Amino acid sequence: MVWQRPDGRKPYELRPINFHTKFTRFAPGSVLTICGETKVLCTVSVAESVPKFLAGSGKGWLTAEYRMLPSATQQRHERELLKLSGRTQEIQRLIGRSLRAAIDFEALGERTLTVDADVLQADAGTRTAAITGGFVALAEAISQLLQRGVLERSPLCGQVAAVSVGLLEQEAYLDLNYIEDVAATVDFNVVMNKNLGIIEVQGTAEEGSFSRTQLNQLLDCAETGIQQLLIAQQKAITDWDELFVGK
């Protein structure tokens, strides 16, 4: 039996993706990322300091925080006040690791970039939307730092995007929504760079197992989506050619 996508998309088709830049007033970088019905506000703040282990090194740092509004899902969930859940800690570490692959920390100097990803509405794919939108917010923040003369040269040496894929009825599907995420027997989160090099793969079988052939199908599916996301990011970053210093 062939899986029928609830929104009528083809197996390798992304949900509509939109980046609303300069979304908030005070953060140097702020982007509302809308991926289908998933909405994530990504902001980037800059501090003129680094963690102790980097003090005096001349290098900067990037870290990330991730939260969900209590009403982001159908049933309200409690705010994480005193202790973060394991899921939240895992996701924000993933966001930080992924976006650090895009930065030349020597060019950044002894500064810390903090990426805040706040989920306003969740229909699956929140962590991948946070990474993809977080990169656009990161570029926006770097652009502002260059315009203000804080940075002499751009530290944006990489481009990063992420997407979810999964097996439904033993076939690969791109960019799962919540209904599909629940139904999938295997689901992956894949992070890649501009050259389609793999930064991170998170994958698990919810029941049973999957073959090497299916693994390759899932990665091919993710690659197709990430190619489109990379193009969408560049279109959203108005001064992309001046900012990007990588290959």
Curated annotation (Swiss-Prot):
One of its GO terms (molecular function) is tRNA nucleotidyltransferase activity. Gene3D superfamilies: GHMP Kinase, N-terminal domain. Its EC number is 2.7.7.56. One of its GO terms (biological process) is tRNA processing. InterPro entries: ExoRNase_PH_dom1, ExoRNase_PH_dom2, ExoRNase_PH_dom2_sf, PNPase/RNase_PH_dom_sf, Ribosomal_Su5_D2-typ_SF, RNase_PH, RNase_PH_bac-type, RNase_PH_CS. Homohexameric ring arranged as a trimer of dimers. This is Ribonuclease PH. It comes from Trichormus variabilis (strain ATCC 29413 / PCC 7937).
